[in-house]
A protein has these predicted regions:
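Hydrophobic faces of well-ordered beta-strands that scaffold small-molecule active sites
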Residues: 18-22, 47-49, 75-77, 92-94, ...
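Glycine-rich phosphate-binding active-site loops on the catalytic face of alpha/beta enzymes
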Residues: 48-54, 91, 95-106, 174-177, ...
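N-terminal amphipathic alpha-helix/helix-capping segment at the start of soluble metabolic enzymes
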Residues: 1-22, 26, 113-127
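C-terminal helical cap(s) of enzyme catalytic domains, especially alpha/beta-barrels
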Residues: 63-68, 108-109, 225-245
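Active-site mouth loops of central-metabolism enzymes
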Residues: 16-32, 78-81, 131-156, 200-205
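Catalytic cores of alpha/beta
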Residues: 77, 81-94, 189-223
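Conserved anion-binding
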Residues: 84-163, 244
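Glycine/Thr-rich beta-alpha phosphate-binding loop at enzyme active sites
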Residues: 50, 141-187, 227-230, 235
Length: 245
């Protein structure tokens, strides 16, 4: 395991973690940098950069470069495609979208992106990316056969397969701006079998929801869309407090 992975695991021993997703397409550089500094103050453990619809590589590289010099917490790439592999980040969620119906998103994009991960010196975090439900960008772009929200055992079976493949991270994704979040029941069911680092994202908008997910066994929560409205930093502060208690 590399430095970023070790850092996340040691931070997790203290309390569940908060990851903030900055979509390089939505954020202007200045506002991205300001947001990153704010969330670092609030207690975010990492900034994820990417998203399923982010395709402008130059723009993303520029955002990453600026974020890297602005904050001390790790910058982790979260690519929706090979264009999301850019230099200067600390690590990358090297993800297979395991419930895609298109092999491109399961292994082909990964093969095309891998040489650049090596070239740029990015620490790969081997991740099974599972999209829950349907109707979101990730679902549409990734040709996903969405795991139904009320079928936690299916998510657990995929997570177990991921573990047997040697993946140390599972990311349960309801999708950006999702109307509902992954259920605590699904998180608990996955947690029973998956021994690695469990990330949950999509539709998390308040501290109650956040707390229910970390209580169920999530190691980290990803907050993204909520922060596209800057007035919601207060909500993030509440979420950060709730999951630390």
């Amino acid at each position: 395991t590399g430095k970023v992975e070790e850092l996340l695991i040691s931070e997790r021993k203290k309390s569940p973690l908060l990851f903030v997703l900055i979509d390089s397409e939505v954020s202007q550089i200045d506002s991205a940098v300001k947001l990153a500094k704010d969330v670092e103050q609030i207690g975010a453990a990492s900034i994820l950069v990417g998203g399923s619809s982010a395709t402008d590589q130059m723009e993303m590289a520029e955002v990453v470069k600026n974020l890297k010099s602005a904050v001390n917490i790790p910058i982790i790439l979260f690519p929706g495609n090979i264009t999301g592999v850019v230099p200067q980040a600390d690590a990358i969620l090297f993800s297979s979208l395991m419930n895609s119906e298109n092999p491109y998103y399961i292994t082909q994009a990964q093969a095309l992106g891998a040489p650049n991960v090596l070239k740029f010196g990015l620490e790969p975090l081997p991740t099974s990316y599972l999209v829950i439900g349907e109707g979101t960008s990730a679902w549409f772009v990734g040709n996903v056969r969405g795991i139904p929200f009320d079928k936690p055992k299916i998510a657990a079976a995929y997570s177990l397969a991921a573990q047997f493949f040697g993946m140390r991270f599972v990311y349960l994704e309801a999708g950006s701006g999702a109307k509902t979040n992954v259920t605590p029941e699904m998180v608990a069911t996955v947690r029973k079998v998956f021994q690695g680092f469990l990330i949950v994202g999509g539709g998390i908008r308040d501290s109650q929801t956040a707390k229910s997910l970390t209580d169920a066994g999530a190691d980290a929560l990803v907050i993204g869309t909520l922060l596209e409205d800057s007035k919601n930093l207060e909500k993030l502060t509440e979420i950060a407090k709730a999951i630390k208690n």
